[in-house]
């Protein structure tokens, strides 16, 4: 019994643990408000639960889902797109898609579906895109899969290994299919007319290793197909027989051979096939390999007529293993006379034989980009009578090194108007060059040139010199309409007077820091300007111009996203249209002028106030007093030499010398007075004499009169006495009114003296002789106090 309980407990614990470790499927989805749900690469092993009608798009690709049940998508009635590619799905229940009548995009590619059921697709009446590639089915089922998909426009079916047969019912009902991709790499059986039911199909991509059934498939689609692309096919065994085709009138306009392997012999078969069906205008070879030497044995070349209708031939990345043994292809020269456009890109072309160039009589466009052309071999290719109708020549990314020689080489091309020689290493440019006289377009981008000179033809209407090392553009090109000069080192816009017809200017990613309204207005015909990606200095003038000109946004095609401030530093990286500078930054001159004016007015006001309230006097007196205080004293402060210092006007000297001195110095005991006329030290600064005399006197007697108030030196003596009153906080001043004087006559700056006159008794000289004795008694008492 205990063992049973123990076993049950262990099973319960394991079950709970597995539940805890199992991921929450619904939480593995991230959905936005529009109903787009992303569940890619979440290691899901089953369909998420809780899917509702709110889901519009569901991506569950790159997971580990193996099974889709009837109820998994039941509520997704509004689902438009369902991506389930790259899972391990091997089972889909019959009614799994029953409610997906709104579904337009379904991708079930690269799963493990070995059997396809028509019941899956029957409810999908709105389906436009269906991808079933990479599943291991052998065929498309016993019953028509797609007969109910009347709105289907793009269909992809097949696989590399197991898809071996196409039956006549497989594509029934797909009347209006636009694009079809079939991976028939291992196709072994094709029932005739299996693709015949498809009408007006635009594009068929057919992947097949061996071309055994190629002609049969082509015949069924020839009357409805416009573009056939053949992929990953080994055409080395391909042989075409005219007897295999009954209908020669086709709708096919373009053939593309992608990653196809051909030999000299099989190439002949391709040419015969293209000749036998009329209407082909364009042939394209991409990433193909030619196992041969160019020895194309084409019998009855003169009978090949329809291939002459081909107007465009494109060859990209052609690999020729025996490249250095390759012939000149002279056997097919006559087939090229009516071709108008040829592109041979990245295929190691170093020479176009002169004879071939002369046969290309209708050629208007030739692109030899990413090859090995040099001036010497280009001269042979552009020989006399070569490419007589050529208008556009593209020699981008070859090995050209001299602009002068390149231009001279092309002089034989009388109708040449457009030349692209970008991504060659010219480095320098001569002062003069010769070019075909009808030149209208020249592309010199990415050629490492440092300057542009008169080598540029004046007949140009379009010039591209972008991605070089130019720091100046000063060419006079009177007919130029478009100038592309981005990714250089220009610091300013070109001079508009040199480009009077300019319509388009692209000058982004240079060293331009600003441009003005005047500069743009000087380009009278300019319609388009692209100047983003420069390091703009967002000055007030630049911001005002760019933000206030509403019409500027119509001219600047990359505005505002690519217009960023580089300085000032606090707005670096911000879009020009969003930057706002402060008043101090935008009106600095006015601000400085205002501050200067305010400072001037402040100084002027200060001077007026100083003059009105004797401010200069206060400062002068304070300075003098401080200087005096800093000087070392000749005698200690207690060594007083005089009883009183007498301050008086020269006009009152008679009264002082004959009355005051006589009454005080001849009194017993005598008083010692200090008079400036008698006791000042000769040669000493007068202010120092005044200060020293006041400091060496116990009292200071001021003989006040109208003359005293008007005397300049008396004012100084009053001044320093005034400072002494503040400094010592004493009552050392004795005022004698020699004659009546109003208090207003004493300057208000002598506030202490005025206060003394208001609060203390002063001596007034009596005119009555009887009262004079009392005056002298009071004076002597005041001096002794």
Swiss-Prot record:
Domain TIR: 640-783
Site for Interaction with bacterial lipopeptide, residues: 350
GO molecular function: NAD+ nucleosidase activity, cyclic ADP-ribose generating; signaling receptor activity; transmembrane signaling receptor activity; triacyl lipopeptide binding
Native species: Canis lupus familiaris
Gene3D superfamilies membership: Ribonuclease Inhibitor (3.80.10.10), Toll/interleukin-1 receptor homology (TIR) domain (3.40.50.10140)
Cytoplasmic topological intervals: 611-785
Family (UniProt): Belongs to the Toll-like receptor family.
Signal peptide: 1-17
Name used for this protein in its record: Toll-like receptor 2
Main location as per UniProt: membrane
Glycan-linked positions: 115, 200, 246, 415, 443
Function: Cooperates with LY96 to mediate the innate immune response to bacterial lipoproteins and other microbial cell wall components. Cooperates with TLR1 or TLR6 to mediate the innate immune response to bacterial lipoproteins or lipopeptides. Acts via MYD88 and TRAF6, leading to NF-kappa-B activation, cytokine secretion and the inflammatory response. May also promote apoptosis in response to lipoproteins.
Repeat positions for LRR: 54-77, 78-101, 102-125, 126-150, 151-175, 176-199, 200-223, 224-250, 251-278, 279-308, 309-337, 338-361, 362-388, 389-414, 415-437, 438-457, 458-478, 479-500, 501-524
Subcellular location: Membrane; Cytoplasmic vesicle, Phagosome membrane; Membrane raft
Transmembrane segments: 590-610
Disulphide linkage map: 31-37, 354-383, 433-455
Renumbered ranges of motif ATG16L1-binding motif: 762-779
Glycyl lysine isopeptide (Lys-Gly) (interchain with G-Cter in ubiquitin), cross-linked positions: 755
Membrane disposition: Single-pass type I membrane protein
Domain LRRCT: 525-579
GO biological process: cellular response to diacyl bacterial lipopeptide; cellular response to triacyl bacterial lipopeptide; inflammatory response; innate immune response; toll-like receptor signaling pathway
The record's account of how the chain is modified after translation: Ubiquitinated at Lys-755 by PPP1R11, leading to its degradation. Deubiquitinated by USP2.
Extracellular side: 18-589
Keyword Glycoprotein: yes
Self-association and partners: Interacts with LY96, TLR1 and TLR6 (via extracellular domain). TLR2 seems to exist in heterodimers with either TLR1 or TLR6 before stimulation by the ligand. The heterodimers form bigger oligomers in response to their corresponding ligands as well as further heterotypic associations with other receptors such as CD14 and/or CD36. Binds MYD88 (via TIR domain). Interacts with TICAM1. Interacts with CNPY3. Interacts with ATG16L1. Interacts with PPP1R11. Interacts with TICAM2. Interacts with TIRAP.
Domain notes: Ester-bound lipid substrates are bound through a crevice formed between the LRR 11 and LRR 12.
């Amino acid at each position: 019994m205990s063992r049973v309980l123990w076993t049950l407990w262990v099973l319960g614990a394991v079950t709970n643990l597995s539940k805890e470790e199992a991921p929450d499927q619904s939480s593995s989805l991230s959905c936005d408000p529009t109903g787009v749900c992303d569940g890619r690469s979440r290691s899901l092993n089953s369909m998420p639960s809780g899917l509702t009608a709110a889901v519009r798009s569901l991506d569950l690709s790159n997971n580990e889902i193996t099974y889709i049940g009837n109820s998994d998508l039941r509520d997704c009635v509004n689902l438009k797109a369902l991506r389930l590619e790259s899972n391990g799905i091997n089972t889909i229940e019959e009614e799994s898609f029953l409610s997906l009548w709104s579904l337009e995009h379904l991708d079930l590619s690269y799963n493990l579906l070995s059997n396809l059921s028509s019941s899956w697709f029957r409810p999908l009446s709105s389906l436009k895109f269906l991808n079933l590639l990479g599943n291991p089915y052998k065929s498309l089922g016993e019953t028509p899969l797609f007969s109910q998909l009347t709105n289907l426009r793009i269909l992809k079916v097949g696989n590399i290994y197991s898809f071996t047969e196409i039956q006549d019912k497989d594509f029934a009902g797909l009347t209006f299919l636009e694009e079809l991709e079939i991976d028939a790499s291992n196709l072994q059986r094709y029932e005739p007319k299996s693709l015949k039911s498809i009408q007006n199909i635009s594009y068929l991509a057919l992947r097949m290793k061996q071309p055994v059934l190629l002609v049969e498939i082509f015949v069924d689609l020839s009357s409805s197909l416009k573009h056939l692309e053949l992929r990953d096919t080994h055409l080395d065994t391909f042989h075409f027989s005219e007897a295999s085709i009954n209908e020669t009138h086709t709708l096919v306009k373009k053939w593309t051979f992608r990653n196809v392997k051909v030999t000299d012999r099989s190439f002949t078969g391709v040419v015969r096939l293209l000749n036998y069906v009329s209407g082909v205008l364009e042939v394209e070879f991409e990433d193909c390999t030619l196992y041969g030497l160019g020895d194309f044995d084409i019998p009855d070349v003169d009978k090949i007529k329809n291939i002459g209708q081909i107007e465009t031939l494109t060859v990209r990345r052609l690999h020729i293993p025996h490249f250095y043994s390759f012939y000149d292809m002279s056997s097919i020269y006559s087939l090229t006379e009516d071709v108008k456009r040829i592109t041979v890109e990245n295929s190691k072309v170093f020479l176009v034989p002169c004879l071939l160039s002369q046969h290309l009589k209708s050629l208007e466009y030739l692109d030899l980009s990413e090859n090995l052309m040099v001036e010497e071999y280009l001269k042979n290719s552009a020989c006399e009578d070569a490419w007589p109708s050529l208008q556009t020549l593209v020699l981008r990314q070859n090995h050209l090194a001299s602009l002068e020689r390149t231009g001279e080489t092309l002089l034989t091309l009388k109708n040449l108007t457009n030349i692209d020689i970008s991504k060659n290493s010219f480095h320098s440019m001569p002062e003069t060059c010769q070019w075909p006289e009808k030149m209208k377009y020249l592309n010199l981008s990415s050629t490492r040139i440092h300057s542009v000179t008169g080598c540029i033809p004046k007949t140009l209407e379009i010039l591209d010199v972008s991605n070089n090392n130019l720091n100046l553009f000063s060419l006079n090109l009177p007919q130029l309409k478009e100038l592309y000069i981005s990714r250089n080192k220009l610091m300013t816009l070109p001079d508009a007077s040199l480009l009077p017809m300019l319509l388009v200017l692209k000058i982004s990613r240079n060293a331009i820091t600003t441009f003005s309204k005047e500069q743009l207005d000087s380009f009278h015909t300019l319609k388009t300007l692209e100047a983003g990606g420069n390091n703009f200095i967002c000055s007030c003038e630049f911001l005002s111009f760019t933000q206030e000109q509403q019409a500027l946004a119509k001219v600047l095609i990359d505005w505002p996203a690519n217009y960023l401030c580089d300085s000032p530093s606090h707005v670096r990286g911000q879009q020009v249209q969003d930057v706002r500078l402060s008043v101090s930054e935008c009106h600095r001159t006015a601000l400085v002028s205002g501050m200067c004016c305010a400072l001037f007015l402040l100084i002027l006001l200060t001077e007026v106030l100083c003059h009105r309230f004797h401010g200069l006097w206060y400062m002068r007196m304070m300075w003098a007093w401080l200087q005096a205080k800093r000087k070392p004293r000749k005698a200690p402060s207690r060594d007083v030499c005089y009883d009183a210092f007498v301050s008086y006007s020269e006009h009152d000297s008679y009264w002082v010398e004959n009355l005051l001195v006589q009454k005080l110095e001849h009194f017993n005991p005598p008083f010692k007075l200090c008079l400036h006329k008698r006791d000042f030290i000769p040669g000493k600064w007068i202010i120092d004499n005044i200060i020293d005399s006041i400091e060496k006197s116990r009292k200071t007697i001021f003989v006040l009169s109208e003359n005293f108030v008007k005397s300049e030196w008396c004012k100084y003596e009053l001044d320093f006495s005034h400072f002494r009153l503040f400094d010592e906080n004493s009552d050392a001043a004795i005022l004698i009114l020699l004659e009546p004087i109003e208090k207003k006559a004493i300057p208000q700056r002598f506030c202490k003296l005025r206060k003394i006159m208001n609060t203390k008794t002063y001596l007034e000289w009596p005119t009555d002789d009887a009262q004079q004795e009392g005056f002298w008694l009071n004076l002597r008492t005041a001096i002794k106090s």
